[in-house]
């Protein structure tokens, strides 16, 4: 199991200046190399200030598009970066799935296999800053680099009663996918052992340790 210790930093000024000082964690596990060998460059940096978790995803990949036009859409079909987290380190988890234009899918997945989608107030509380802007666009061929910053308040874990990230230990995984891109791919930070692409595997999350 991989582990990341997340530093506590009180942000002031531009977030990018803080992210520039932090290590890049690679989303590089190609878990299904026979069927889906393509491995774009993807990674993330992160810190927290107690009340919010700050994540910057950084991607370089071929052939991108932005078809999803609203939150809670089919985010995984566009260039998509994902953060799945279990606040209690068990089989209950949330999935934050964000496209290259900042469209977000967020839901709560308790261990009984039901799903509860986040409401508009919770979605709006997760601030997103995509480098490509927020408007949809058609297929852009060739290599492209993009990033998105997500600011996730503890209250976005809306069924867990988390008030602060201070001193917490959680389990999580980070992903890069694009199911309907010219070259579909399914990458993870922590390895996944499963017969087919599936990111909904909380038993195979890594560990996050919050300062």
Describe the residue ranges of each PLM region.
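Structural preference for beta-rich elements and adjacent junctions enriched in aromatics
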Residues: 1-211
């Amino acid at each position: 199991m991989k582990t990341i210790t997340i530093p506590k930093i009180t942000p002031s000024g531009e977030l990018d200046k803080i992210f520039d000082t932090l290590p890049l964690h690679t989303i590089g596990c190609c878990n299904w190399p026979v069927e889906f060998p393509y491995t774009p460059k993807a990674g993330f940096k992160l810190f927290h200030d107690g009340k919010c978790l700050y994540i910057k995803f950084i991607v370089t990949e071929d052939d991108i598009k932005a078809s999803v036009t609203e939150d809670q859409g089919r985010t995984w079909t566009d260039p998509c970066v994902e953060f799945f987290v279990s606040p209690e380190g068990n089989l209950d988890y949330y999935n934050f799935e964000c496209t290259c234009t900042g469209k977000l899918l967020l839901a709560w997945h308790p261990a009984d296999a039901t799903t509860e989608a986040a409401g508009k107030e919770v979605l709006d509380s997760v601030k997103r800053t995509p480098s490509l802007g927020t408007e949809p666009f058609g297929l852009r061929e060739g290599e492209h680099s993009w990033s998105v910053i997500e600011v996730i308040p503890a209250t976005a874990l809306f069924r867990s009663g988390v008030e602060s990230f201070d001193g917490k230990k959680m389990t999580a995984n980070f992903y890069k996918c694009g199911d309907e891109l010219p070259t579909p791919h399914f990458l993870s930070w922590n390895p996944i052992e499963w017969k087919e692409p599936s990111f909904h595997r909380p038993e195979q999350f890594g560990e996050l340790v919050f300062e």
